[in-house]
A protein has these predicted regions:
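Extended, small-residue-rich solenoid/repeat segments and analogous flexible loops
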Residues: 1-37, 41
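Flexible, glycine/small-residue-enriched loop-and-beta-strand segment within the central core
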Residues: 5, 31-38, 43-129, 155-161
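Conserved beta-strand positions that form and line the central face of beta-propeller blades
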Residues: 27-29, 49, 141, 151
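Short alpha-helix at the nucleotide-sugar/activated-sugar donor binding site of glycosyltransferases
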Residues: 84, 134-135
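Conserved catalytic segment of ABC-fold P-loop ATPases
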Residues: 131-134, 147-149
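A generic "structured core" feature
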Residues: 135-141
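Short helix N-cap motif at coil->helix boundaries in the Bergerat
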Residues: 144
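Acidic, glycine-centered active-site loop in nucleotide-sugar glycosyltransferases
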Residues: 148, 153-156
Length: 161
């Protein structure tokens, strides 16, 4: 049965840092706990997986990460404050390029700035940078920079403010 971890259970996770008033489901999986920082007021829902045995994951204040999400911090993932990462979002800082005869690994940091909203089942690829107050539509695939206050959906970028 799903529930939020108690203060003692949060402390016993032995993350690099866990802030105050965080709500983390007991069904969240962590790999590389010593490389994961979660600031105050953040909520992470059921069946989310955070992998940082190589690299790191930093999550800002008052951010929500919906259930069934996956964050892979091989080269680093930085998520700002007051973000909403919807259910099923995948964030990768490592990927593979099979377009040539030889497999080439792509390792690039992902930066998600403050007050960003990412819709359900979106995929954020290595090297992506999403600036403040931007929105990513559900099912979108981001592989580049989304400038401040823009909406990216259906492979289009639109200024929203």
């Amino acid at each position: 049965m799903s529930r939020y971890l108690t203060k003692l259970e949060l402390k016993n996770l032995k993350l690099k840092y866990i802030g105050k008033n965080c709500k983390i489901s007991n069904l969240v999986s962590f790999v590389g706990k010593k490389n994961i920082t979660i600031l105050d007021g953040t909520r992470i829902d059921d069946f989310t997986v955070l992998v940082a045995h190589k690299g790191y994951i930093n999550i800002g204040k008052n951010t929500h990460i919906g259930g069934l999400s996956y964050i892979q911090g091989w080269k680093g993932v930085e998520i700002g404050s007051e973000c909403n990462i919807s259910q099923g979002v995948k964030i990768y800082s490592k990927s593979d390029n099979y377009t040539k005869k030889k497999n080439i690994q792509i390792l690039k940091k992902v930066i998600i700035s403050n007050r960003v909203i990412i819709g359900s089942n979106a995929v954020i690829l290595p090297g992506s940078k999403i600036e403040d107050d931007s929105r990513i539509g559900a099912l979108s695939v981001v592989s580049h920079k989304i400038t401040k206050q823009h909406l990216f959906a259906r492979n289009r970028i639109v200024k929203i403010y």
